[in-house]
A protein has these predicted regions:
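Conserved GTP-binding G-domain of TRAFAC-class P-loop NTPases and closely related GTPase folds
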Residues: 37, 158-230
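Glycine-rich phosphate-binding loop used to anchor ATP phosphates in small-molecule kinases
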Residues: 95-147
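Conserved phosphate-donor/acceptor-positioning beta-strand/loop module used by diverse small-molecule
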Residues: 143-162
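Conserved substrate/cofactor phosphate-moiety recognition/catalytic segment
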Residues: 57-117, 158-160
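The conserved Walker
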Residues: 51-52
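Phosphate-binding P-loop
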Residues: 36-43, 113-116
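Hydrophobic anchor at the beta1->P-loop junction of P-loop NTPases
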Residues: 48
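N-terminal pre-Walker A segment at the start of P-loop NTPase domains
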Residues: 1-37
Length: 230
Protein backbone atom coordinates (compact mmCIF):
# COMPACT_ATOMS: atom_id res chain seq x y z
CA UNK A 1 0.00 0.00 0.00
CA UNK A 2 1.28 3.48 -0.83
CA UNK A 3 0.80 6.36 1.61
CA UNK A 4 1.36 10.07 1.12
CA UNK A 5 4.52 11.73 2.38
CA UNK A 6 2.96 13.44 5.43
CA UNK A 7 2.13 10.00 6.84
CA UNK A 8 5.46 8.32 6.20
CA UNK A 9 7.05 9.31 9.50
CA UNK A 10 4.26 8.03 11.73
CA UNK A 11 5.56 5.52 14.21
CA UNK A 12 3.80 2.19 14.84
CA UNK A 13 2.00 1.62 18.11
CA UNK A 14 3.89 -0.53 20.64
CA UNK A 15 2.27 -3.90 21.19
CA UNK A 16 0.10 -6.06 19.03
CA UNK A 17 -3.43 -5.05 18.03
CA UNK A 18 -4.36 -8.68 18.53
CA UNK A 19 -3.42 -8.70 22.22
CA UNK A 20 -6.37 -9.61 24.44
CA UNK A 21 -6.26 -7.64 27.72
CA UNK A 22 -6.79 -9.53 30.95
CA UNK A 23 -10.13 -8.63 32.55
CA UNK A 24 -10.20 -7.27 36.07
CA UNK A 25 -12.08 -9.54 38.50
CA UNK A 26 -15.78 -8.73 38.67
CA UNK A 27 -15.46 -6.17 35.88
CA UNK A 28 -16.08 -7.96 32.61
CA UNK A 29 -17.75 -6.98 29.32
CA UNK A 30 -20.90 -8.63 30.68
CA UNK A 31 -20.65 -6.74 33.97
CA UNK A 32 -18.57 -3.59 33.36
CA UNK A 33 -19.40 -1.90 36.63
CA UNK A 34 -18.92 -5.03 38.73
CA UNK A 35 -22.55 -5.00 39.84
CA UNK A 36 -23.54 -7.60 42.38
CA UNK A 37 -26.02 -10.29 41.31
CA UNK A 38 -29.61 -9.12 41.67
CA UNK A 39 -28.76 -5.42 41.49
CA UNK A 40 -30.30 -3.20 38.83
CA UNK A 41 -27.52 -1.55 36.80
CA UNK A 42 -27.85 1.83 35.18
CA UNK A 43 -28.58 1.72 31.44
CA UNK A 44 -25.37 1.24 29.54
CA UNK A 45 -23.56 3.74 27.33
CA UNK A 46 -20.91 2.14 25.10
CA UNK A 47 -18.58 4.61 23.41
CA UNK A 48 -16.84 2.89 20.50
CA UNK A 49 -13.56 4.71 19.91
CA UNK A 50 -10.61 4.40 17.58
CA UNK A 51 -8.66 6.29 14.96
CA UNK A 52 -10.28 7.02 11.58
CA UNK A 53 -10.39 3.79 9.59
CA UNK A 54 -10.41 1.55 12.67
CA UNK A 55 -13.78 0.07 11.74
CA UNK A 56 -16.06 1.81 14.25
CA UNK A 57 -18.96 2.31 11.84
CA UNK A 58 -18.72 -1.27 10.58
CA UNK A 59 -18.82 -2.60 14.14
CA UNK A 60 -21.76 -0.37 15.08
CA UNK A 61 -23.71 -1.37 11.98
CA UNK A 62 -23.29 -5.04 12.88
CA UNK A 63 -24.43 -4.36 16.44
CA UNK A 64 -27.48 -2.43 15.19
CA UNK A 65 -28.45 -5.38 12.98
CA UNK A 66 -27.83 -8.01 15.64
CA UNK A 67 -29.17 -6.18 18.70
CA UNK A 68 -32.27 -4.32 17.45
CA UNK A 69 -33.17 -3.12 20.94
CA UNK A 70 -30.02 -1.00 21.13
CA UNK A 71 -29.75 2.65 20.09
CA UNK A 72 -26.78 3.41 17.82
CA UNK A 73 -25.52 6.93 17.08
CA UNK A 74 -23.10 7.03 14.15
CA UNK A 75 -22.22 10.01 11.92
CA UNK A 76 -22.21 7.69 8.91
CA UNK A 77 -26.00 7.65 9.09
CA UNK A 78 -26.11 11.43 8.64
CA UNK A 79 -23.49 11.28 5.90
CA UNK A 80 -25.68 8.91 3.92
CA UNK A 81 -28.67 11.18 4.48
CA UNK A 82 -26.83 14.23 3.15
CA UNK A 83 -25.48 12.23 0.20
CA UNK A 84 -28.99 11.18 -0.84
CA UNK A 85 -30.23 14.76 -0.82
CA UNK A 86 -27.27 16.56 -2.38
CA UNK A 87 -26.14 16.42 -6.02
CA UNK A 88 -23.71 13.57 -6.64
CA UNK A 89 -20.95 15.99 -7.61
CA UNK A 90 -20.84 17.56 -4.13
CA UNK A 91 -17.84 16.03 -2.32
CA UNK A 92 -18.15 14.75 1.24
CA UNK A 93 -15.50 17.25 2.33
CA UNK A 94 -17.94 20.07 1.57
CA UNK A 95 -20.45 18.93 4.18
CA UNK A 96 -18.32 16.88 6.55
CA UNK A 97 -18.54 19.67 9.14
CA UNK A 98 -22.35 19.47 9.04
CA UNK A 99 -22.31 15.69 9.50
CA UNK A 100 -20.10 15.83 12.56
CA UNK A 101 -21.88 18.85 14.04
CA UNK A 102 -25.20 17.03 13.73
CA UNK A 103 -23.76 13.86 15.26
CA UNK A 104 -22.31 15.81 18.19
CA UNK A 105 -25.63 17.60 18.77
CA UNK A 106 -27.68 14.39 18.69
CA UNK A 107 -25.22 12.63 20.99
CA UNK A 108 -25.37 15.51 23.46
CA UNK A 109 -29.17 15.45 23.36
CA UNK A 110 -29.33 11.72 24.13
CA UNK A 111 -26.86 12.04 26.99
CA UNK A 112 -28.51 15.09 28.54
CA UNK A 113 -32.02 13.69 28.51
CA UNK A 114 -30.77 10.54 30.22
CA UNK A 115 -31.94 6.95 29.81
CA UNK A 116 -35.54 6.55 28.69
CA UNK A 117 -36.14 2.90 27.86
CA UNK A 118 -33.26 1.18 29.60
CA UNK A 119 -31.87 0.08 26.23
CA UNK A 120 -28.10 0.36 25.70
CA UNK A 121 -26.83 3.41 23.82
CA UNK A 122 -23.81 2.97 21.52
CA UNK A 123 -21.96 6.07 20.31
CA UNK A 124 -19.30 6.53 17.63
CA UNK A 125 -16.39 8.73 18.70
CA UNK A 126 -12.69 8.67 17.91
CA UNK A 127 -12.06 9.03 21.67
CA UNK A 128 -8.46 10.04 21.02
CA UNK A 129 -8.94 13.43 22.71
CA UNK A 130 -8.54 12.60 26.38
CA UNK A 131 -10.29 15.67 27.81
CA UNK A 132 -13.23 15.29 25.44
CA UNK A 133 -13.43 11.59 26.27
CA UNK A 134 -13.43 12.19 30.02
CA UNK A 135 -16.01 14.98 29.69
CA UNK A 136 -18.24 12.62 27.73
CA UNK A 137 -17.97 9.99 30.44
CA UNK A 138 -18.61 12.48 33.25
CA UNK A 139 -21.68 13.90 31.52
CA UNK A 140 -23.06 10.43 30.85
CA UNK A 141 -22.61 9.31 34.45
CA UNK A 142 -24.18 12.49 35.81
CA UNK A 143 -27.29 11.82 33.71
CA UNK A 144 -27.78 8.24 34.85
CA UNK A 145 -25.79 6.23 32.30
CA UNK A 146 -23.21 3.56 33.10
CA UNK A 147 -20.44 4.55 30.64
CA UNK A 148 -18.06 2.02 29.12
CA UNK A 149 -15.30 2.73 26.61
CA UNK A 150 -14.35 0.24 23.90
CA UNK A 151 -11.23 1.29 22.00
CA UNK A 152 -10.88 -0.52 18.67
CA UNK A 153 -7.21 -1.32 18.16
CA UNK A 154 -5.70 -1.44 14.67
CA UNK A 155 -2.29 -1.04 13.11
CA UNK A 156 -1.36 2.07 11.16
CA UNK A 157 -1.60 0.25 7.83
CA UNK A 158 -5.00 -1.21 8.69
CA UNK A 159 -6.34 2.21 9.66
CA UNK A 160 -5.16 3.75 6.39
CA UNK A 161 -6.52 0.81 4.39
CA UNK A 162 -9.82 1.14 6.25
CA UNK A 163 -10.16 4.72 5.07
CA UNK A 164 -9.44 3.71 1.48
CA UNK A 165 -11.94 0.86 1.67
CA UNK A 166 -14.73 3.14 2.85
CA UNK A 167 -13.86 5.76 0.22
CA UNK A 168 -13.33 8.61 2.70
CA UNK A 169 -9.77 9.54 3.58
CA UNK A 170 -9.07 11.93 6.43
CA UNK A 171 -6.70 14.80 5.65
CA UNK A 172 -3.13 13.65 6.36
CA UNK A 173 -2.44 16.33 8.96
CA UNK A 174 -5.66 15.51 10.78
CA UNK A 175 -4.93 11.79 10.80
CA UNK A 176 -1.42 12.50 12.09
CA UNK A 177 -2.91 14.23 15.13
CA UNK A 178 -5.30 11.34 15.79
CA UNK A 179 -2.53 8.78 15.46
CA UNK A 180 -0.10 10.66 17.70
CA UNK A 181 -2.73 10.98 20.43
CA UNK A 182 -3.56 7.29 20.04
CA UNK A 183 0.05 6.15 20.32
CA UNK A 184 0.45 8.26 23.46
CA UNK A 185 -2.58 6.66 25.12
CA UNK A 186 -2.69 3.07 23.91
CA UNK A 187 -0.40 1.54 26.52
CA UNK A 188 -2.26 3.20 29.38
CA UNK A 189 -5.60 1.98 28.03
CA UNK A 190 -4.27 -1.55 27.62
CA UNK A 191 -2.91 -1.53 31.19
CA UNK A 192 -6.41 -0.93 32.55
CA UNK A 193 -7.28 -4.52 31.60
CA UNK A 194 -10.98 -3.72 31.36
CA UNK A 195 -10.99 -1.97 34.72
CA UNK A 196 -12.48 1.43 35.56
CA UNK A 197 -10.86 4.77 34.89
CA UNK A 198 -12.30 8.12 35.92
CA UNK A 199 -16.00 8.17 34.99
CA UNK A 200 -15.75 4.96 32.95
CA UNK A 201 -16.94 1.73 34.57
CA UNK A 202 -14.76 -0.24 32.18
CA UNK A 203 -12.16 0.57 29.53
CA UNK A 204 -11.48 -2.17 26.98
CA UNK A 205 -8.87 -2.33 24.25
CA UNK A 206 -10.08 -4.76 21.58
CA UNK A 207 -8.60 -5.79 18.26
CA UNK A 208 -10.95 -4.99 15.40
CA UNK A 209 -11.35 -8.65 14.47
CA UNK A 210 -12.27 -9.57 18.07
CA UNK A 211 -14.55 -6.68 19.07
CA UNK A 212 -17.94 -7.72 17.67
CA UNK A 213 -18.78 -10.65 19.92
CA UNK A 214 -18.00 -9.07 23.33
CA UNK A 215 -19.64 -5.76 22.40
CA UNK A 216 -22.72 -7.59 21.08
CA UNK A 217 -23.04 -9.64 24.26
CA UNK A 218 -22.53 -6.57 26.40
CA UNK A 219 -25.32 -4.74 24.57
CA UNK A 220 -27.65 -7.75 24.70
CA UNK A 221 -27.25 -8.26 28.42
CA UNK A 222 -28.19 -4.65 29.09
CA UNK A 223 -31.49 -4.79 27.23
CA UNK A 224 -34.41 -4.26 29.62
CA UNK A 225 -35.44 -7.29 31.65
CA UNK A 226 -37.99 -9.41 29.82
CA UNK A 227 -36.97 -8.14 26.39
CA UNK A 228 -37.06 -11.21 24.08
CA UNK A 229 -33.96 -9.95 22.26
CA UNK A 230 -31.74 -10.53 25.30
Amino acid sequence: MTTSAPLSWLRPVPGSPGDSPHRAPGNTPDNPAGNTPGSTPDPLLIVVGGVPGAGKSTLLARIADDVPGSVVLDPDRYRRGFARRLPSWVPYAAYRWAVHTLHAAVTLLYLLRGPRSGAPLLVHDTATRERRRESLGLLARSRGWDPVLVAVDVSLDDALDGQLDRGRVVRPEEFVRHWERWTAQRSALADLDGGPRGPWSGVYLMARCDAFRPVRELARRRLPAGDPRR
